[in-house]
């Protein structure tokens, strides 16, 4: 198949999943065309079967804000027409689904087929999409898509609850390359980060308010108060970082906390972790804890959103009530001080990630879904030209 993929190319879960999906599809013989305003950050180089088409937005004095959605639509039409795309898969509803639906409709006027699959990732539904400025457009774009997927059952239900959706939403979870994400021998790195015998707690996020990184620091403070020698490694960057840095100083634990900034890949850091801690207020899936689990790291996470789908049944960690610092600290201390429990959880984490979320099994689900959507579209529009 010749597949177009549009995503936000910046640091974030939806962009990571879209890029990794494209790369995996390319290795399976499909021709992949990324359409975005810059090269996706995990697409370090364009390789065989992978092409990149940059969306340029011209600035005119008349426009206070550059009309990116329209420029994206035009680029989608251009790529679909001249690269003979079989399908366009957009990640994150705003504005990608809207642009894709418009591009499809433009091509239909020329008797050309371009089935559109929209994947919902989280804040495009739970936060941004419910803003009154966007809600009607998001609702229309989802209903007008030829196929819709969500990354968790939680997000699927949230979409039905928040919008007037008339189409079926298929759940295809996020995935990782479990050969790539595995525990590495990094004792030299560990010795450079912490003293012998110290425990290593890791948190990875974009430091936005919803991630509650300040709660991570407060939980870690409780861990230290229990006499546990430990280091906290904070990976990522974002608007709350300066506030979190100040909190570590206010609590007097700044020397036990390392801010590592954006790191890609993160498996070297996860390979020295004893525990992964996530205190988010909302997570549609939980890609960061999945990466930790694949590296054999027990997890302690908020009992919110799609996280229970990932953690429950895995025997790889604990879920805690949102905002309950004491409960989080108790769970973390239990994992860090019980060696046999830690070893069992680490083993279960790796096994569960490989069994349920490996690239090969999930990408196969997307391939099957693409074929279904292409076939259905062709049957519904027999006079439309299907690319050969």
Question: Where are the predicted features?
Answer:
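Short hydrophobic beta-strand element within catalytic cores of glycosyltransferases
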Residues: 298-301, 311
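Aromatic "clamp/platform" in nucleotide-sugar-dependent glycosyltransferases that forms part
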Residues: 262, 281
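A short helix/loop element that forms part of the nucleotide-sugar donor recognition site in Leloir-type
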Residues: 182-195, 341
């Amino acid at each position: 198949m010749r597949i177009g993929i549009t995503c936000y190319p910046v640091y974030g879960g939806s962009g990571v999943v879209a890029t990794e999906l494209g790369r995996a599809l390319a290795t399976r013989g499909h021709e992949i065309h990324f359409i975005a305003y810059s090269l996706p950050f995990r697409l370090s180089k364009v390789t065989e079967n992978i092409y990149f088409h940059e969306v340029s937005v011209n600035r005119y004095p008349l426009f206070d804000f550059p009309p990116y959605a329209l420029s994206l639509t035009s680029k989608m039409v251009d790529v679909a027409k001249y690269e003979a795309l079989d399908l366009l898969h957009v990640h994150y509803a705003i504005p990608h689904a809207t642009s894709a639906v418009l591009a499809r409709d433009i091509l239909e006027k020329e008797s050309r087929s371009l089935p559109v699959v929209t994947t919902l990732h989280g804040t495009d539904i739970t936060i941004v999409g419910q803003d009154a400025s966007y809600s009607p457009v998001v609702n229309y774009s989802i209903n007008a898509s030829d196929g819709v997927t969500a990354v968790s059952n939680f997000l699927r239900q949230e979409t039905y609850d928040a919008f007037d959706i008339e189409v079926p939403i298929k759940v295809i979870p996020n995935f990782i390359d479990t050969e790539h994400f595995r525990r590495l021998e990094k004792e030299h790195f560990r010795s450079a980060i912490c003293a012998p015998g110290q425990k290593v707690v890791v948190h990875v996020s974009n430091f936005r308010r919803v991630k509650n990184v300040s709660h991570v620091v407060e939980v870690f403070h409780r861990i230290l108060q229990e006499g546990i020698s430990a280091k906290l490694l904070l990976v990522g960057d974002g608007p709350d970082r300066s506030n979190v840095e100040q909190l570590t100083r206010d609590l007097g634990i700044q020397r036990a906390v390392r801010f590592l900034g954006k790191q890609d890949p993160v498996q070297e850091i996860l390979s020295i972790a004893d525990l992964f801690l996530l205190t988010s207020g909302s997570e549609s899936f939980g890609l960061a804890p999945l990466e930790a689990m694949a590296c054999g790291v027990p997890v302690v996470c908020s009992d919110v959103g799609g996280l229970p789908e990932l953690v429950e049944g895995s025997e790889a960690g604990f879920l805690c009530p949102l905002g309950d610092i004491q409960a989080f600290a108790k769970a973390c201390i239990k994992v860090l001080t019980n060696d046999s429990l830690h070893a069992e959880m680490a083993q279960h984490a790796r096994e569960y990630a490989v069994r349920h979320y490996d690239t090969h099994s999930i990408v196969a689900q997307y391939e099957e879904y693409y074929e279904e959507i292409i076939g259905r579209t062709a049957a519904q529009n027999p006079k439309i030209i299907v690319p050969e």
